[in-house]
Every structure is written in C-alpha cells, then in structure tokens.
Amino acid sequence: MNVAVIGAQWGDEGKGKIVDYLAGEAAAIVRFAGGANAGHTIVANGKQYALHLVPSGILYPEKKVYLGSGMVIDPEALFNELESLKANGVQWEGRVFISERAHIVLPRYREEDKKRDSERVHPIGTTGRGIGCAYSMKSERDGIRIADLEWQEKRTEWTKEDRAFLDRYSDRLCAMKVNMTCEMYRLKNEKVLLEGAQGAMLDLDSGTYPYVSSGMSCAAGACVGAGIGPRAIDRILGVFKAYSTRVGNGPLPTEFDEQSQSELYRYVRDTGREYGVTTGRARRCGYLDLVALRYACRVNSITELALTHLDIYDTLDTIEACTAYNIDGTITEDFPASIEKLEKAKPVLQSFAGWKTPLKACQNYKTLPPHARSYIEYIEQYCGVKVSIVSVGYERQDTFMRNDPFDGKR
C-alpha cells in the first residue's frame, strides 16, 4: 500500500515529523521531489535532527529509504548530511538508495540560482542551493543524471570543473543507485510512504506562480518521483499547521500585520520556532487560511489531513481562521490563480474560543479540550476532509492518530 504525504500549505508544515511518526509501520520511505532547499526537523528520543535530502524514515534502523526520480541531488550536501547522521549514531550504510533518474546539482548552479533571482523584477527569494537551476537544466535536456555517472563517454560532454566535482562522488553514488520502478514493484505488497517536499501551494503548476518551487510538490509528483502510475497511490495525506507560514516572497493573504499585530506575530513565530531549517530565515506567519487549504485538498485529491502545531495556540483566548477573501469588495471562497488578486485579498475571519489548556498532556482525540475539538471539526467541515492525525508537540510521542492512513478505510 502506498501513502503519499504532502504539505498542504507553503511548506514547513511538519511533514518530516508526520513521516517519521508513520515510518514505524512502513517497509520503505521514498522522498519523491525537491532538493537540499527543503528542511525537515525531527525530534526523536530527545535528539533533534535536521534533514534536507535524506527521507525522514532514516531514523528507524531497519528501514530502507529512497531518494526518488523527481529529486535534484547535491552530492556534497548529501554526503555531509549522511556523515552528520552517522556522527549522531544513525547507521545509514546499505539503507539509502538513489534513483538512477534523479538529477545532480552542480556547484555552479548555486551562483546561477542567486544571479537569476537577483535579476528578476520580482525576486522569488531563492535559498541559493542551485535547485531552480538544476530543474531548469533538466527541462532543457542539459542536466546530468545519476545514471550518467557510470558511462565514460558522457564525461567528454562535461566541463573540467564538473568532471572534477563528480569524480569525488561518482563511485559512492553509483553504489547507491537503483531503478525506482523495479524497487516499487518489489515493494508492491508492502507499506510504502512517499514523502513530499515544500508544499502544495509552492507547486510549479498549482501553486502561487511565479512564487513557487521548481519541482512537483503536489500529489502527482509522488507518481513521477516513485516511478509508479496514479492508480498505485492508495491514500494522500495532507499535512497542515494550525496557522499559516511562508518563507521568502509571494502572497500570504492571511499574514499578520507586523505593526498592528506584532505581539501575535512574535508569539506564533517564537513559540512555533518559525525559522527556516535550511536558511535560518524567520518565516512569515498568519491565520490559518481555509480557502487555500480547501483548494489544496481538492487539487491534490487529499484523502485525509494531519494537523500540526495545534499546541502553539494553547494560551490564546481567541483563535481566528480565514474562511473567505475580500477582493476589491467581492467576497469569494475560491482560491484565485491571479497573483494580483491574491495580493489584494483581505481575509474574512471566523473566531473560535481558545482552550487555554496545555495540549501536550493529551493522549488521544477524546482527551482534547472541547474548544480544540470544535476548531478541528470546523476545519473538517469546511474542507470536506477528515483530520486523521493531530500533533501537539515536537516529540514523536506528542502525536496521536484518529485513523491510520495505512488501514485503507475512507
């Protein structure tokens, strides 16, 4: 059974934690898109791990993890990450595999990424990791794939600098390469997690273009990255926070006003640790955007949701969420494609009573305070999708499941 896990907002929703939580019952975990621009923070057994390329299931010693076909991989960043894991007691040898169709990020791509963004009229706010350039080279048919490394004839097409860089990693990368379609066929009777990067609202086609990532962060990307067809995806789990965040430029219709709502902004940012794992940049924060969340559910055929960071609201008297946009006097519940409309959108807010109780002590859904359950049930009713998993803290155990995505029940 294959369960895809995607971000249902603008990234940083807590996908890594949810994948880590579910990975215990999976045979394998496949990261299907993105590169070292992504960042997952996982807290397990009192230790904090920051992952950028390696799938979140790596912390389970018996699990196999795969870097899928839709990824763009910086070999230097990958092996630095693997060495860091090893230094922290995580034995990864023989458990990490790379799709032979994955593309490689070269050092010169990083500077090219920064240069391109600086020349834009409206800069995107790239991480400068070379990801956009790698995907651009891929679409122009000029990229280098893992499969190319074993062919000496290919080397004549590369620059001297590229050859020198790749020579340092070729043998190790080739030893880890696999045919993803064959691997997934062998795993057809097993439970497999397909792990996304960034979020649905950053997808190149269905996100807030042009302020998007270059890869496929939508559910469809799971098929491409894992080397399987759409019918092979059994469940799609969308992860979202109890509020909205975004890194870099682009519209965030429910963003807190840093002047009139500075206290609320600082509280959410600091209590929620809303600083980028990859860049360290403070994330922009705002109310939960139900218009965007419902759109993400529909465009990705999300079958269930996982709610994270619910505990960040523990001390608030009142909680608000956006249920519609006011765009030049017109009220709409539909998420527009136009960036111009999104930048004009003012949130129409619905108020909810706060629960004023620490949620970390809650062991299951029934023990949540009534006001917390009401907040969740309103989200379910608005989006038309059930919340199957709730996270009330950073540790693995601060998570409880109402319905297991792997049981196949709708």
Spans of features found by a protein language model:
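Non-transmembrane, aqueous-exposed alpha-helical and coiled segments at domain scale
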Residues: 1-410
